[in-house]
Amino acid sequence: MAVGLGPLSTLHPVPGFELGIASAGIKRPGRKDVVVMRCAEGSSVAGVFTLNAFCAAPVTLAKQRFLGEVRYLLTNTGNANAGTGEAGPAAAAQTCAKLAELAGVAETSV
């Protein structure tokens, strides 16, 4: 997390990319708790992931999904969802599946 940075003076639009926030009910009810990014069809994406052998379920899922076509990126606010046991991968997949359903895209593209 960046420390000591001031607010951006201008946030320039990026063609083929949209960014938004939403309440998914992951945190407190009504709180904006996810960031949703839409990539235009045919976009190329890249990711930089931890090299740590122990990482959160959403990171593991993202590494797999980045091998195919990515249309949406989904991140939760706050701390990582690490150390969640078997429930972690299931919750990560379920959250992506719901966004895919709402967006009308393949689950593997989220």
PLM region descriptions:
Residues 39-41, 62-64, 76-79:
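Fold-independent oxyanion-binding glycine-rich loops
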Residues 77-104:
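Alpha-helical support elements that line or immediately flank enzyme active sites
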Residues 1-49:
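N-terminal amphipathic/basic leader segments beginning at the initiator methionine
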Residues 45-67:
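Glycine-rich oxoanion-binding loops at beta->alpha junctions
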Residues 105-109:
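Flexible, glycine/charged-enriched surface loops at secondary-structure junctions
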